[in-house]
């Protein structure tokens, strides 16, 4: 499909002999918001980390199968390039504590030795913070440490850091689980705005959040992709009994 941005083909992930993601096949389109849900230990975060080759950074972790980005297997690409095209935002806000807000935004360039002029850095910082709905709040405090910000602001700073590398796809691993309700609402609003320019894949334990923010939802159980469908359809008439059991709270 011409509109497909990322596709998994028979993707499997392991920690040693532990088979944690099993034969996943899924196609995700450009400018979609995808929720990935399932009980703890079902493989959803491991799958997410496989998309941008972060799974392989864990000792004793291996993978088989393909993850295709724009039709090309990410395992045939330079890993640093892959992680610039596929950004990631983690569960807890993690700005670099010794860097200023300004430096945090361009950290990807600094860490990878990519030379950028001061004028270009200024443009990248303003555009990225604006896209993350943070510029107006911090434009007069760019010299302050990233940890100076509130939890919700720190998470939006981390989103700006991902955006700065001009990715096609942004992965979110339970990005609001450590935030208060007001900050969570701000980040969820941001998801809808980011969809215009990026594809978002969001791992969440919060079924209400999945229903609010996503176009389609993937349900994982015991390492398997059980169901992948339009979010409204999945929540109102799931095709698989295991999905129904999870949604209705029969297991968690």
Q: Where in the sequence are the language-model features?
A:
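Short helical segment in ABC ATPase nucleotide-binding domains corresponding to the A-loop/adjacent helical element
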Residues: 52, 101-111, 122, 214
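ABC ATPase NBD coupling module
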Residues: 60-62, 73-87, 111, 196, ...
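Conserved ABC ATPase "signature" region
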Residues: 66-73, 118-140
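Conserved ABC ATPase signature
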Residues: 144-149, 153
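Conserved catalytic motifs of ABC-family nucleotide-binding domains
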Residues: 166
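Catalytic Walker B motif of ABC-type/P-loop ATPase nucleotide-binding domains
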Residues: 170-173
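ABC ATPase "signature
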Residues: 228-229
């Amino acid at each position: 499909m011409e509109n497909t941005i990322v596709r998994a083909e028979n993707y499997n992930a392991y920690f040693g002999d532990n088979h944690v993601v099993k034969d996943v096949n899924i196609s995700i389109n450009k400018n979609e918001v995808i929720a990935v849900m399932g009980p703890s230990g079902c493989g959803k975060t491991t799958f997410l980390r496989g998309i941008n080759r972060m799974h392989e950074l864990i000792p004793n972790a291996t993978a088989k199968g393909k993850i295709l980005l724009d039709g090309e297997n990410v395992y045939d690409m330079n890993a640093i390039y892959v992680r610039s095209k596929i950004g990631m935002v983690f569960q807890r806000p993690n700005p670099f504590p010794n860097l200023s807000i300004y430096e945090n935004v361009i950290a990807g360039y600094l860490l990878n030795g990519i030379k950028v002029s001061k004028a270009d850095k200024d443009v990248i910082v303003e555009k990225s913070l604006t896209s993350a709905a943070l510029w107006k709040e911090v434009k007069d405090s760019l010299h302050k440490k990233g940890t100076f910000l509130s939890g919700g602001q720190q998470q939006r700073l981390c989103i700006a850091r991902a955006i700065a590398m001009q990715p096609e796809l942004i992965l979110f691993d339970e990005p609001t689980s450590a935030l208060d309700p007001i900050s969570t609402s701000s980040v969820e609003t941001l998801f809808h705005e980011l969809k215009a320019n990026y594809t978002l894949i969001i791992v969440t334990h919060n079924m209400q959040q999945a229903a609010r923010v996503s176009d389609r939802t993937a349900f994982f159980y015991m390492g398997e992709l059980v169901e992948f469908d339009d979010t409204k359809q999945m929540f109102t008439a799931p095709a698989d009994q295991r999905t129904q059991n999870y949604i209705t709270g029969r297991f968690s």
